[in-house]
Amino acid sequence: MATSSEEVLLIVKKVRQKKQDGALYLMAERIAWAPEGKDRFTISHMYADIKCQKISPEGKAKIQLQLVLHAGDTTNFHFSNESTAVKERDAVKDLLQQLLPKFKRKANKELEEKNRMLQEDPVLFQLYKDLVVSQVISAEEFWANRLNVNATDSSTSSHKQDVGISAAFLADVRPQTDGCNGLRYNLTSDIIESIFRTYPAVKMKYAETVPHNMTEKEFWTRFFQSHYFHRDRLNTGSKDLFAECAKIDEKGLKTMVSLGVKNPMLDLTSLEDKPLDEGYSISSVPSTSNSKSIKENSNAAIIKRFNHHSAMVLAAGLRKQQAQNGQNGEPSSVDGNSGDTDCFQPAVKRAKLQESIEYEDLGNNNSVKTIALNLKKSDRYYHGPTPIQSLQYATSQDIINSFQSIRQEMEAYTPKLTQVLSSSAASSTITALSPGGALMQGGTQQAVNQMVPNDIQSELKHLYVAVGELLRHFWSCFPVNTPFLEEKVVKMKSNLERFQVTKLCPFQEKIRRQYLSTNLVSHIEEMLQTAYNKLHTWQSRRLMKKT
């Protein structure tokens, strides 16, 4: 069943799964089902593993809810309580609509790149577990420099162009009859994102009203019923939620019209009809064919709507570029139309003129082609080249002569064992070479790999790699000449202290319990103390400068 730390958000009883009665539990991070009379879950799905949910159409005999997983599997739940089946199913559906977006998988390129790096490099994976999983440093700090190094790879560094918004994305919203003289719209997350990017006023209204004043279903129902969606209606209801959005769009359209399109290669004002007078000259009197007001023109509303829709679709891409590149502190307007006015600034104007009069094929290409160094497996470069030692090679004849000489000496050899070593000298030598003898004072350091178990050696290696990574971040902050480095060096000091408490001290206690020498970690402690002394010296000099 649910653990004591899990928060149960909703419990629905009389829910069947494969013709077996049970109860459905919605918790903070997963949905689970337990058979009736059992104290354990037989079905449990994390919200991050759920792709979408589906419900049975209205009028069906069975009130069901289906969960579709990312792996392609499905799970069906049948709400068997006749009196409250629809109400309970809708309650589960509405709660899942709020929970699933929070746990939506982020299957982007950056995450795939991180997974690939961890799978290909076991040392990096172990370092990730020692530092990030144990919460010594954050994941952002761990990946700060590593992703930048891999960005130089030609396969991953190419900037992928984002998919724009289709001009007919609303045409994909095909209403279906629900059998009760009503319409049902099926909205996907892509369509909702396109609506928000095209109409920032709707996104602002969504943030204001959902879920504070109404549910998401009510919001989109009122959106498709509103005058804002049906622009060809003549009158706007007084209680229309989107009346303000239409006014904001009208204001933005007037601003765009007043600014015009400042394209030096195209003059749109010259396309206006200019009738000739009787004397074959341009008449200054306005034509009677265009004397009708906009309100009298039945096509003006739909033309204005098309123009505004096209402008907003184009502006959505510009707003995304400014959000990625622009951190210049310029305020943006509420209606989101501020990006539309910057399309043809002088820099863009010069670029368009240069594009029209220059040809790349005729220009001189003076750029030097360089090849970026890409180390696929860095552990292959940890060891330097082995120096070549001068060796004297013997020929086959030299080897034969040496063998014959040794053979002749061995034939005439007579052993004299009593004159080799006396018994007292042999006894004193054995005593000096025994553990605790005069010649065995430094023997522990030479045989540490034989005295320490393999698991302790492996853990000690992991500690060295982890502390080396932390110290690399620490020493890279010097010289501390920016506010960012000042903040980072103080933060890295706290990370080193956290590593010492959570990793180094438990390891010392472990080897102490096994009656091993605590000198195993003396070098790590020395490196940490050197870093602390460096930070203390920098802080002292900083205080002296301030005083």
Curated annotation (Swiss-Prot):
Keywords: Acetylation, DNA damage, DNA repair, Nucleus, Phosphoprotein, Repeat, Transcription, Transcription regulation. One of its GO terms (cellular component) is transcription factor TFIIH core complex. GO terms for biological process: cellular response to leukemia inhibitory factor; nucleotide-excision repair; transcription by RNA polymerase II. The modification N6-acetyllysine is found at K239. InterPro entries: BSD_dom, BSD_dom_sf, PH-like_dom_sf, Tfb1/GTF2H1, TFIIH_BTF_p62_N. It is found in: Nucleus. It holds the Pfam family PH_TFIIH. CDD domains: PH_TFIIH. The keyword Protein biosynthesis does not apply. Residues 319-342 are annotated as: Disordered. Residues 99-154, 179-231 form the BSD domain. Residues 321-340 have a biased composition (Polar residues). The modification Phosphoserine is found at S338, S356. The keyword Nucleus applies. PROSITE patterns: BSD (PS50858). Component of the general transcription and DNA repair factor IIH (TFIIH) core complex, which is involved in general and transcription-coupled nucleotide excision repair (NER) of damaged DNA and, when complexed to CAK, in RNA transcription by RNA polymerase II. In NER, TFIIH acts by opening DNA around the lesion to allow the excision of the damaged oligonucleotide and its replacement by a new DNA fragment. In transcription, TFIIH has an essential role in transcription initiation. Belongs to the TFB1 family. Component of the 7-subunit TFIIH core complex composed of XPB/ERCC3, XPD/ERCC2, GTF2H1, GTF2H2, GTF2H3, GTF2H4 and GTF2H5, which is active in NER. The core complex associates with the 3-subunit CDK-activating kinase (CAK) module composed of CCNH/cyclin H, CDK7 and MNAT1 to form the 10-subunit holoenzyme (holo-TFIIH) active in transcription. Interacts with PUF60. This is General transcription factor IIH subunit 1.
